[in-house]
Curated annotation (Swiss-Prot):
MF (Gene Ontology): structural constituent of ribosome
Pfam families linked: Ribosomal_L34
BP GO terms, sorted: translation
Species this chain originates from: Lactococcus lactis subsp. cremoris (strain MG1363)
GO CC term, one of those recorded: ribosome
Assigned keywords, A-Z: Ribonucleoprotein, Ribosomal protein
Protein name, as recorded: Large ribosomal subunit protein bL34
Amino acid sequence: MKRTYQPHKKSRKTTHGFRSRMATKNGRRVLAARRRKGRASLTV
C-alpha cells in the first residue's frame, strides 16, 4: 500500500507557502496567530 505522504516541493509551496497564506483572509489569520505565538518559522 502506498503511503499518504508523497512529498513534492511545488504542492507544498502552493498549499502552505507564504504567498498562498497571504492570498486569503483566513490565511492571514494563520500568519497573525503564528506571529503572536512567536514562531521561528511562519510558513514552509
